[in-house]
Amino acid sequence: PQNDVWRHGHCPVCGSPAFIGHLSGPEPSRNEGRDINKGGKRMHTCSYCRTTFRAKRIQCPFCLEEDAKKLDYFTTENEPGYQVHVCRSCKSYIKIADFREFFGRESIPALDDLESLPLDIAAQNEDFHRVAPSEWGL
């Protein structure tokens, strides 16, 4: 079920890696520009079969690192609603759509991936790599 957290680094249906994710749940509260509400669910979408499944919030979906000091994320002003979650252990990243503040906006994984393409470039410029290919061949 979608409410169960899948703690493994691959799709529960076909075993492929996730290519993008999104946050769902309550809107985040803000304190000096940072999220302080840790509520909401982190959902990932499989790169092969497109199954959406719930993932652990503080964990690299690829190497399963859980040390918060090795996990981080960044955003840019030019791509509101998107985060890039990076792992310093395996140097991978995954983009996460966070539309909780955009009333009525829904995550559509393939379109989210295309719309946030500049974030792939930013992550790769910082020497992070994408594990699962995008719909667009990147």
Where are these regions (language model features)?
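Cys/His-clustered metal-coordination modules, chiefly Zn-binding fingers
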Residues: 1-123, 128
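Short flanking/linker segments adjacent to small metal-binding domains or redox-active Cys/His motifs
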Residues: 100, 133-138
